[in-house]
């Protein structure tokens, strides 16, 4: 045996018994640690450690994917994470009492923040690839659905997120458990001589980690300390080994474990400091970090400079000269203007200079957002409103100040009254109004943000009212028309219930503020008289009609439409004016329906509904189209033309009113012209809905609004007014449609009345050939109508020659006249017409196939005639056969006409008998 494997003791005074024991111990160690020669360390882990290690590994993968914005792999890793958490649920419920680990909640919170950040970056989303964009939408939906089960845990986490990294905590727990297990294995494998190895990890747990005062300490100092500690402990380690082989075997030592613990503690400490520093920064204000050297804020004036109006104006020109240039700090420009305003107010330089600075601040705020199509930030919006109202109040409080865009800069006057300032408050308020519309379009209409933004309309209207007061004092007619139109556009779509109450006499007309209808009349009449442009007058007329229709002034609205001839030249108007025209026609149709003018309501709505695109025509959304039907630029322009959500007209209400009006007109017309082959369709859309329902083999109970109207139409065709009314007026239809009207109960009563009247007309048209006479009181009882109303309906039908009958007043009956053909006769006549048309069509097709359209003696076709003659050996047999066939067809046609005349004569003789 080599001396290398001899006893590790150097003393020669040991006994032979000790040598035997050492040799036996050496054999046992050789057998027991045979795996160590392959440098493999067996570790037995619990189920909890396996599951937690799997979760932490996937979380690290997700974090790496998020850093490089690899969204598809983030999606797949998130799916793996949910599956791993599902597997770990039994362990969590057993070990953690069902409490979700904090590192898992942190991962979900970070993932949600990452998705929200990417989703809110609209420009970045546009640049994403198709795969990334699709994966982002899928990931967003899955995460939002998944975290609903962890809402309480996420809320608690977001209240106190400044704790140690949970993934590191999970690793620390796993490491501690591995160390404990290593100690247990050493107790069982090595024996009592290595008992200190089992105690060292526990001692390492109990010793707290020292926090270095200097943040620049690195891991090198830790390694240096660990090396010095290892030298002092080397003598103790030598006593733990019984032979030289065990000492020099490669293994994971206690020193290495201790060094790893120190490094990990150091990393945890540094991460905790960084996170705490970031949280402290969040408590303060945000600062813009400028690339390169930090530029100091320029000084406004010299220390001993005398502040006067020319100096302030020169500084104002200097600040505004950088407007629109590249690399201009727009935020700094706004701050400098505010500082200049404060300086001018401190030195009491006068109101005119303050107004001038206010106007330049407004221009600078507008310039901050370089992309005109995008809305401005909310902080700038609030600042803009404040500065605008402050400037207008100064202008109204000082009548000697005249602010106009026609004033040249060299003619501005700030020293003595009257003051002249170059600027246009009208253009500023128009831009303000446009920015308000952009803000509304950008918000989700079903969120609280939209409601918050809509509350700003009060301030916008106040600002417009201030401009109206200013231009009524010193403005031209053109400027007044422009600002009046802005006020009209904020007023025309709003319903004022006091107008209807005054109309009914519920409110006194005198001694109260003017109603919205009176204000609209005043503004619109001024525009009608003073406007020089067709566009402002056209939009004012459309808004005026819309407002009249909102308040049930049907005749005034109708007269304005007819006298203005808008329908003749609206095609030449701009798109926004055409959209306003469509909105006006839709609201006019609703007004006609409420005022019991069913035919007028149908005429107003038919152009909108027959196209199948009322949503686009009213600018309330875009319909999905094919790839090449609309370019990206066109779609962007159309989105800018969309109306804000609070100005939308309910499309289901429009369609229901249109279909009900069509039903009340179409069903009696179909019954009156049942056997007329050439009858026209009043409403193509309604007719298609009715025919598609009739083609179905099995029709269930109605569910949608369209199905209710179709079912009501079928009931009306049979004269069953009660079933028809139940389909139109019920709880579901009330919720969807009729409750949207202002006086819904009156509308429902009007509907039931019209259903009774039109059902009566349909019944008389359908069953008039069955009766010889009908009692008017029985009809009144059947349809629950007053007797004079039934008498009036039947009289109108007789006068218009719709019903061949006469009234017998003494007996109160309707006597039917048998002038119209019976059902069999009408069908026979219809059959003859169709057969005749079919014969004519067949003859034309046959003649075209045989070439009968060539004229005889056509010299341009000599060659073909010569060849045909050669083939027929000088005889024109084909032409003779064709002439004979044509003669035979003419004879047959004459025979059919004779038969038709004979049938008509027979019908007349039967009727006379």
Swiss-Prot record:
Composition bias (Basic residues) maps to: 264-276, 887-898
State where the protein is found: Cytoplasm
Give all residue intervals belonging to the PCI domain.
Answer: 645-821
Q: Which cysteines form disulfides?
A: none
Q: Which GO terms describe its biological process?
A: formation of cytoplasmic translation initiation complex
This protein's UniProt keywords: Cytoplasm, Initiation factor, Phosphoprotein, Protein biosynthesis
Q: Where is the composition biased (Basic and acidic residues)?
A: 172-184, 244-263
Membrane-spanning regions, if any?
none
For the modification Phosphoserine, the affected residues are: 34, 165, 177, 186
The record's GO CC annotations read: eukaryotic 43S preinitiation complex; eukaryotic 48S preinitiation complex; eukaryotic translation initiation factor 3 complex
Q: Where is the composition biased (Acidic residues)?
A: 11-20, 162-171, 214-239
Q: Which InterPro entries match?
A: EIF3C (IPR027516), EIF3C_N_dom (IPR008905), PCI_dom (IPR000717), WH_DNA-bd_sf (IPR036390)
Renumbered to this chain, region (Disordered) spans 1-31, 157-195, 208-285, 856-913
Q: Name one Pfam family in it.
A: PCI
Compositional bias of kind Polar residues: 21-31
GO terms for MF: RNA binding; translation initiation factor activity; translation initiation factor binding
Role: Component of the eukaryotic translation initiation factor 3 (eIF-3) complex, which is involved in protein synthesis of a specialized repertoire of mRNAs and, together with other initiation factors, stimulates binding of mRNA and methionyl-tRNAi to the 40S ribosome. The eIF-3 complex specifically targets and initiates translation of a subset of mRNAs involved in cell proliferation.
Partners and quaternary state? Component of the eukaryotic translation initiation factor 3 (eIF-3) complex. The eIF-3 complex interacts with pix.
Family under the similarity heading: Belongs to the eIF-3 subunit C family.
Q: What is this protein called?
A: Eukaryotic translation initiation factor 3 subunit C
Species of the source: Drosophila virilis
- Gene assigned in the entry: eIF3c
